[in-house]
């Protein structure tokens, strides 16, 4: 596992592609994934959620997640990433809340949502105004179908999750291994070993 933190700006990225294993990572963008063929597993914390064609998954900003492909055959999905700027009035709630169950099953998704996602895929990315308007429709139709809880309740209480969450929360600050270990209530030697062996990060002490 390698920690990846992407600092997105004023951008919406949408692509339909073959699904593959994606290691645990996080970013400050909203991520929406819609399975278009086959199946996909969305991992949030220690939970793994099975998705099939038509299911839509929502990963709010700064939530650790990963993807796995366990189903044989052709598995494809539309992946949409939207920076905090582009999610407008939904930005504040997404900073503090997250879906308790991040999947909306296909039978609960309105046909309009699929049409709008396809429209985002077909929009020229040079003009963000149109895809941003489409995104608001997707969120307006879908957010109400998700049970939102405090973001701290989503994921895992294990040390790996706490460490990645700490790094993401303090991503733009300078902090030492000793400071992080103290804040997490563990030995710096235990923490250093975890970061090196599990996250594959060379932490400068």
Feature-to-residue mapping (PLM):
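N-terminal positioning helix adjacent to the helix-turn-helix/winged-helix DNA-binding module
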Residues: 109, 155-163, 199
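Localized chelating/binding microdomains
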Residues: 30, 167, 186
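Basic/polar phosphate-binding segments, predominantly the helix-turn-helix DNA-binding elements
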Residues: 146, 174-205
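A hydrophobic/aromatic-rich effector-binding and dimerization subdomain
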Residues: 1-16, 57, 61-126, 139-148
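Generic protein-terminus/edge-of-domain signal
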Residues: 1-56, 63, 70-71
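All-alpha amphipathic helical-bundle segments outside canonical DNA-binding/catalytic cores
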Residues: 123-137, 154-157
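Short helix-capping/hinge SLiMs at alpha-helix to coil transitions
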Residues: 169-173
